[in-house]
Amino acid sequence: MSDFTVEIECEIDGRWIGEVVDLPGVLAYGASRDEAVAKAKALAFRVLADRIERGITVADL
């Protein structure tokens, strides 16, 4: 569950955006491609931890 697929794209203004494919709405901006990916993965872990804390079943990703 720790190997997330992150789609990345460079915005017109030069910022990078990374979106975790298996978790809709989990996306993050970064100044570089690597930063956007790292931030998106970190956010994905936070979202999963929150779901677990609230007793929501987390399917294998």
Protein language model features and the residues they cover:
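Short, charged, surface-exposed hinge/linker loops at domain edges
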Residues: M1-T5, D34, A38-L61
